[in-house]
Amino acid sequence: MTKLVNSARLVELDVDVVSAAFRRFDRIFSAPYPVSLALSGGKDSLCLHDLVYRYVTTHPEVRRRLDVYFCDEEAIFPECEDCMRFAREQWASVGVSFYWLALPFKHNNCFHSLEDAETWVCFDPKARECWVREPPDFAIKSHPIFQFPGQWNFQQALAILTRGRIRVAGVRANESLQRLSAIKRALAKDGGEFRLTPSRLQYPIWDWKDSDIWLYIKERGIPYPRCYERIYAINGKRKLRISQFFSIDTAGSLARMAEYYPGLWEKICRREPNAYLAALYFESEMFRRTSRSQVSGTGGRDYKALCMDLFKSGNYAKATDVRSLLYNAVSYAVYMTPDLWRELYNILSAGDPKQRSKRAFLASLKSRLNT
């Protein structure tokens, strides 16, 4: 188990992560509030689902206070749907409500990166004839909180639907520098434990590493989407993302993954016409892939000049964000390495809707300033 000390560093404790998660469940369910569990169908949420399910079967008194939500993104792999159907059956067997939400959530779309906005809408009524797949008959397909399609993303919608309840999610600090920083700030502010109040998010597996996730899946024999194995063969272990088909983290591997699913690529291109870019430019900087010559510094490209050219083109809807990044880069040019210029160029050319790469870039620049 990992613990934060003085909000600045991590230390290892003599407690395994599974036992730590169950201790957190004791604390969560001891609070006098109902609890909601949010699932995505990915590896983290499957582990969290199994942990909570085990806890509920040994603590039947908490069943009436728990409900489970799954946000269907329309464009998902068949194995993900199968895993969530199985999870639904498990929760039904213990009398816990399971809500399958097939609502018009908005999502990031890297194929429209110049807009830098959440432009793709799941189960958009205006594009019904082009849906990648139909939702199950039992799914919730409309809700009063949506006055128009794409009004909310799934995080915003869940916050509204579960207002007054403690929300449990499978977010881990190990996933990115940004999540680690956010969790550190939250724990430091709350005194070492996430504050238990209605509508507050709880992260029982925040300190799990990737190896903990896969070891737990193996030891428990949890059914998981086999598409992870195919993505591993394509992208390696650091890019195992299967949700949000059109986000920058997933879109690049779409064309290759579709080879395993007959008819899927045609459905994807019909739903998002710009998806052909993933097939044409998967091995390029558009999807943040770097050749050996670029890594070794022999690529012969002046990324500083390329960054300036991109900015001068004036094609960005949010030019203030670009100007801010370039201002930091130019102001501290003496600290900018070729790798940092290349990283900045990738952000500007490939898009960064969630601004994760922007925060990572600024953190790298800050670390250079402090050395």
Give residue ranges: language-model regions:
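Nucleotide-activated chemistry modules centered on ATP-dependent adenylation/adenylyltransferase
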Residues: M1-S36, K43-T371
